[in-house]
Protein backbone atom coordinates (compact mmCIF):
# COMPACT_ATOMS: atom_id res chain seq x y z
CA UNK A 1 0.00 0.00 0.00
CA UNK A 2 1.22 3.50 -0.81
CA UNK A 3 2.05 5.22 2.49
CA UNK A 4 0.84 8.59 1.18
CA UNK A 5 -2.60 7.09 0.54
CA UNK A 6 -2.62 5.55 4.00
CA UNK A 7 -1.69 8.89 5.56
CA UNK A 8 -4.88 10.31 4.02
CA UNK A 9 -6.85 7.50 5.67
CA UNK A 10 -5.17 8.33 8.98
CA UNK A 11 -6.08 12.01 8.66
CA UNK A 12 -9.70 11.03 8.02
CA UNK A 13 -9.82 9.36 11.45
CA UNK A 14 -8.21 12.46 13.04
CA UNK A 15 -4.76 10.92 13.54
CA UNK A 16 -2.23 13.74 13.84
CA UNK A 17 1.31 13.06 12.71
CA UNK A 18 4.50 15.06 12.22
CA UNK A 19 7.03 15.33 9.44
CA UNK A 20 8.80 12.34 7.92
CA UNK A 21 6.44 9.61 9.13
CA UNK A 22 7.71 6.43 7.48
CA UNK A 23 5.25 3.56 7.08
CA UNK A 24 6.70 0.25 5.86
CA UNK A 25 4.05 -2.30 5.01
CA UNK A 26 0.40 -1.83 5.92
CA UNK A 27 -0.17 -0.88 9.56
CA UNK A 28 -3.61 -0.53 11.12
CA UNK A 29 -3.78 2.89 12.77
CA UNK A 30 -7.20 3.98 14.04
CA UNK A 31 -8.39 6.79 16.27
CA UNK A 32 -11.87 6.40 17.79
CA UNK A 33 -14.14 9.44 17.69
CA UNK A 34 -13.51 11.59 20.77
CA UNK A 35 -10.00 10.17 21.33
CA UNK A 36 -6.53 11.53 20.54
CA UNK A 37 -3.81 9.83 18.51
CA UNK A 38 -0.65 11.89 17.92
CA UNK A 39 2.55 10.69 16.23
CA UNK A 40 5.66 12.92 16.35
CA UNK A 41 8.28 13.78 13.74
CA UNK A 42 10.65 11.22 12.20
CA UNK A 43 8.70 8.18 13.40
CA UNK A 44 9.19 4.82 11.66
CA UNK A 45 6.40 2.22 11.72
CA UNK A 46 7.41 -1.15 10.27
CA UNK A 47 4.54 -3.45 9.50
CA UNK A 48 5.93 -5.96 7.03
CA UNK A 49 7.85 -9.12 7.83
CA UNK A 50 10.47 -8.03 5.28
CA UNK A 51 11.01 -4.70 7.04
CA UNK A 52 12.46 -6.29 10.20
CA UNK A 53 14.26 -9.60 10.04
CA UNK A 54 13.70 -10.35 13.74
CA UNK A 55 10.51 -11.99 12.44
CA UNK A 56 7.28 -10.03 12.68
CA UNK A 57 4.19 -12.10 13.48
CA UNK A 58 1.63 -9.41 12.70
CA UNK A 59 1.36 -5.95 11.30
CA UNK A 60 1.60 -2.89 13.51
CA UNK A 61 -1.68 -1.97 15.20
CA UNK A 62 -2.10 1.42 16.90
CA UNK A 63 -5.64 1.98 18.22
CA UNK A 64 -7.48 4.29 20.58
CA UNK A 65 -10.53 2.32 21.66
CA UNK A 66 -12.62 4.70 23.79
CA UNK A 67 -13.65 8.36 23.74
CA UNK A 68 -11.20 10.32 25.88
CA UNK A 69 -8.40 7.80 25.31
CA UNK A 70 -5.07 9.01 23.99
CA UNK A 71 -1.91 7.71 22.36
CA UNK A 72 0.99 10.16 22.16
CA UNK A 73 4.11 8.96 20.36
CA UNK A 74 7.12 11.31 20.58
CA UNK A 75 9.65 12.29 17.93
CA UNK A 76 12.22 9.81 16.57
CA UNK A 77 10.40 6.67 17.73
CA UNK A 78 10.80 3.39 15.84
CA UNK A 79 8.61 0.29 16.07
CA UNK A 80 8.14 -3.03 14.26
CA UNK A 81 5.04 -5.22 14.31
CA UNK A 82 3.91 -3.56 17.54
CA UNK A 83 0.42 -3.44 19.05
CA UNK A 84 -0.40 -0.23 20.96
CA UNK A 85 -3.98 -0.35 22.27
CA UNK A 86 -5.42 2.37 24.51
CA UNK A 87 -8.70 2.66 26.39
CA UNK A 88 -7.25 5.28 28.82
CA UNK A 89 -3.89 6.53 27.60
CA UNK A 90 -0.41 5.63 26.40
CA UNK A 91 2.54 8.01 26.13
CA UNK A 92 5.81 7.03 24.46
CA UNK A 93 8.73 9.44 24.88
CA UNK A 94 11.01 10.64 22.12
CA UNK A 95 13.98 8.60 20.86
CA UNK A 96 12.43 5.31 21.99
CA UNK A 97 12.93 2.05 20.07
CA UNK A 98 10.25 -0.64 20.35
CA UNK A 99 11.26 -4.14 19.27
CA UNK A 100 9.40 -6.54 17.03
CA UNK A 101 6.07 -7.97 18.21
CA UNK A 102 5.91 -5.90 21.39
CA UNK A 103 2.46 -5.32 22.93
CA UNK A 104 1.63 -2.13 24.86
CA UNK A 105 -1.84 -2.59 26.39
CA UNK A 106 -3.40 -0.20 28.90
CA UNK A 107 -6.31 -2.52 29.64
CA UNK A 108 -7.20 -6.14 30.39
CA UNK A 109 -9.57 -6.55 27.38
CA UNK A 110 -12.00 -8.30 29.74
CA UNK A 111 -12.72 -8.38 33.48
CA UNK A 112 -11.25 -11.18 35.58
CA UNK A 113 -14.45 -11.81 37.59
CA UNK A 114 -16.94 -14.14 35.86
CA UNK A 115 -20.01 -12.09 36.82
CA UNK A 116 -18.58 -8.88 35.39
CA UNK A 117 -17.37 -10.74 32.28
CA UNK A 118 -20.91 -12.06 31.74
CA UNK A 119 -22.29 -8.50 32.00
CA UNK A 120 -19.80 -7.46 29.37
CA UNK A 121 -20.96 -10.25 27.04
CA UNK A 122 -24.49 -8.83 27.24
CA UNK A 123 -23.34 -5.22 26.82
CA UNK A 124 -25.38 -3.39 24.17
CA UNK A 125 -22.19 -1.68 22.94
CA UNK A 126 -20.62 -5.01 22.04
CA UNK A 127 -18.27 -5.16 25.00
CA UNK A 128 -16.88 -1.66 24.51
CA UNK A 129 -17.50 -0.63 28.09
CA UNK A 130 -16.07 0.89 31.24
CA UNK A 131 -16.33 -2.57 32.82
CA UNK A 132 -12.91 -3.28 31.29
CA UNK A 133 -10.12 -2.38 33.76
CA UNK A 134 -7.68 0.17 32.28
CA UNK A 135 -4.84 2.40 33.56
CA UNK A 136 -2.57 4.77 31.61
CA UNK A 137 0.94 3.77 30.54
CA UNK A 138 3.90 6.16 30.40
CA UNK A 139 7.14 5.24 28.64
CA UNK A 140 9.93 7.79 29.08
CA UNK A 141 12.41 9.23 26.60
CA UNK A 142 15.35 7.24 25.21
CA UNK A 143 13.93 3.85 26.18
CA UNK A 144 14.61 0.56 24.42
CA UNK A 145 12.01 -2.20 24.53
CA UNK A 146 13.20 -5.62 23.33
CA UNK A 147 11.24 -7.86 20.98
CA UNK A 148 8.18 -9.74 22.23
CA UNK A 149 7.91 -7.67 25.42
CA UNK A 150 4.48 -6.99 26.90
CA UNK A 151 3.87 -3.67 28.67
CA UNK A 152 0.75 -3.91 30.85
CA UNK A 153 -1.71 -1.35 32.18
CA UNK A 154 -0.44 1.20 34.69
CA UNK A 155 3.23 0.72 33.79
CA UNK A 156 5.58 3.68 34.07
CA UNK A 157 9.09 3.46 32.61
CA UNK A 158 11.46 6.30 33.50
CA UNK A 159 13.73 7.87 30.88
CA UNK A 160 16.47 5.59 29.55
CA UNK A 161 14.93 2.27 30.63
CA UNK A 162 15.86 -0.92 28.79
CA UNK A 163 13.31 -3.75 28.69
CA UNK A 164 14.64 -7.21 27.86
CA UNK A 165 13.18 -9.41 25.14
CA UNK A 166 10.05 -11.26 26.23
CA UNK A 167 9.65 -9.35 29.50
CA UNK A 168 6.14 -8.94 30.95
CA UNK A 169 6.22 -5.49 32.52
CA UNK A 170 3.86 -4.06 35.13
CA UNK A 171 4.63 -1.37 37.70
CA UNK A 172 6.81 1.71 38.06
CA UNK A 173 10.50 1.71 37.18
CA UNK A 174 13.09 4.41 37.86
CA UNK A 175 15.08 6.02 35.02
CA UNK A 176 17.89 3.93 33.48
CA UNK A 177 16.54 0.62 34.83
CA UNK A 178 17.36 -2.64 33.03
CA UNK A 179 14.14 -4.65 33.29
CA UNK A 180 13.86 -8.37 32.49
CA UNK A 181 11.74 -11.44 33.15
CA UNK A 182 8.18 -12.54 33.84
CA UNK A 183 7.17 -10.88 36.03
CA UNK A 184 9.64 -8.18 35.05
CA UNK A 185 12.03 -6.77 37.64
CA UNK A 186 14.93 -4.32 37.59
CA UNK A 187 18.25 -6.19 37.64
CA UNK A 188 20.54 -3.14 37.47
CA UNK A 189 20.97 0.37 36.10
CA UNK A 190 22.16 0.93 32.53
CA UNK A 191 25.56 2.35 33.59
CA UNK A 192 26.39 -0.63 35.84
CA UNK A 193 28.16 -3.85 34.80
Task: Please give the residue ranges for each predicted region.
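Domain-scale signature associated with acetyltransferase and cell-envelope carbohydrate enzymes
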Residues: 1-112, 123, 132-142, 149-151, ...
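Short glycine/proline- and charge-enriched loop/turn segments
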Residues: 117-128
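Extracellular carbohydrate recognition
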Residues: 155
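Binuclear metal-ion centers of metallo-dependent hydrolases, dominated by the metallo-beta-lactamase
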Residues: 163
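Glycine-rich GHKL/ HATPase_c ATP-binding element in histidine kinases
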Residues: 167
